[in-house]
Amino acid sequence: GISRASIDKFSVYYDSFSDRLVYPIRNPDGKIVNIGGRTLDPHWKEKGLRKYTYFMSWGELKTIYGLAENRDAILQKGEIILFEGCKSVLLADTYGIHNTGAILTSHLNPNQMKLLAALGCRVVFALDKDVCIRDDHNIKRLKQFVNVQYLWDKDNLLGEKDSPVDRGQETWKKLYEGRLSLR
């Protein structure tokens, strides 16, 4: 599970009224720009609930979740590992991996691409198994500015909808060590 220290670091709280985890989403300067929520109800689909909800509608996201909290570690390592969802950032933080962020969807938008280019460090995409980053136009554009790598589950260690951190630290380590460069 996710450690109390990681929950506190990212200011995650439980909303008993909606049975959701709620968390602030910050811009790169640390200012809260939205509040996200993730249902804990295992029957959310059958009940017609949204898995994720946000206080304000987004339009096009202009931030990367976790960038403000993890900026120092990202710059120190010269690398940012990008997941789809915030849960993966929290789980990686629990594993002691602090150079992470989440794009909060399965594709990179132009605003996020500009943020990553401005960071100037290696970008490692660690998206869910069912996502093929080679089809993403903005990821292809990003490689003009920075070194882009990605995780590929060639040994079928993950379930179809799993994030690379969902199956434990050993699985994560194998996937990370086998990362490939986007050409």
Region annotations inferred by a language model:
Residues 82, 120-132:
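Acidic beta-strand-to-loop metal/phosphate-binding motif
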Residues 100-103, 122-126, 149-150:
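Short hydrophobic alpha-helical runs that function as membrane-insertion/retention elements
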Residues 1, 142-143:
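Hydrophobic, Leu/Ile/Phe/Ala-enriched alpha-helical segments that form helix-helix packing faces
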Residues 103-109, 128-131, 154-155:
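Short, acidic/turn-prone active-site loops that include or flank metal/cofactor-
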Residues 75-79, 121, 140, 147-158, ...:
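A charged alpha-helical hairpin associated with nucleic-acid processing machineries
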